[in-house]
UniProtKB/Swiss-Prot annotation:
Name of this chain's protein: Acetyl-coenzyme A carboxylase carboxyl transferase subunit alpha
Primary localization class, coarse: cytoplasm
Residue ranges occupied by any CoA carboxyltransferase C-terminal domain in the UniProt entry: 48-308
One protein family per Pfam: ACCA
Keywords for the protein's UniProt record, in alphabetical order: ATP-binding, Cytoplasm, Fatty acid biosynthesis, Fatty acid metabolism, Lipid biosynthesis, Lipid metabolism, Nucleotide-binding, Transferase
Function: Component of the acetyl coenzyme A carboxylase (ACC) complex. First, biotin carboxylase catalyzes the carboxylation of biotin on its carrier protein (BCCP) and then the CO(2) group is transferred by the carboxyltransferase to acetyl-CoA to form malonyl-CoA.
The protein's annotated pathway: Lipid metabolism; malonyl-CoA biosynthesis; malonyl-CoA from acetyl-CoA: step 1/1
Amino acid sequence: MANRVVLDFEKPLFELEAKLEEMRVYLRNSSRDQDSSDQDVLNREIEALEVKVETLRRSIYKNLTRWQKVQLARHAERPFTLDYIYMMTRDFVEMAGDRYFSDDKAIVGGFAILEDIPSGFSQPVMIIGHQKGRDTKSNLYRNFGMAQPEGYRKALRLMKLAEKFNKPVITLIDTPGAFPGIEAEERGQAEAIARNLFEMARLTVPVICVIVGEGASGGAIGLGVGNRILMAENSWYSVISPESCSSILWRSWNYKEQAAEALQPTAEDLLAQGIIDRIIPEPMGGAHTDPEAMAGTLKEMLIEELRILMSKESDVLVRERVEKFSGMGVWDE
């Protein structure tokens, strides 16, 4: 528990769990020296504390605020794209480079086989997503999941390759935004994202987009045009982060909680607004508490969606995708 990453709202639970663990250790170490009545008393105290821990856990995670969900989406131990790829698929072949400038490590992708042996489902897919790092060194290598123009161009190259071989495309979105540096702008960041929107809308193969963590602005939508949009329970998807919104409206990051409430960036919010199609349930406490279970749930939902989408003709897929995104938003005439 010493190395566990604890968010501010999780501290009461963490402290209670630590106390429970201390009591268990004490019971194990002193069991030979205590008589049975003392052990019974301690066992009852442990059982009562276990109930208290579970009650507190449910109270916290069943009543998360929007800002707390944003924090969970950024959790350092949350599974990233490559984690999902290796847990959900086999025979992944990573492909590199945009064939124009370089290979952006903030976006990974390649062909893999998504299969479910009991049901007999086995399908080669092109799977692409943002990739963050676990520590300072790997985050610098991955640019904190913020893609350069060549990252989006690499993603588009892989999507067009999937279209050529008539294979479905799956994108996993987890980014704090596209890289905003001067060099990215010089190499056409806006054009690269816009080109992806244009081309993804016209792909003749099924496209499923999944927000697994952060979904910030153009950096997210650059991989986000699909027939079906799925979203993890504790992820967020918005035109701007709560902190940036707060700094613009209130000239301070201190109002990020209010900004999160106003932005309504959570899966429940976006499902109600018709922006996404399904919410992926997470284990209690977040995807990082049981990555294998989370990957299993996502894999099951992807297979369900692919079975439906792969039965449709190419022109139907394109038409439904365009109509889906054309119908989003609210405006006055």
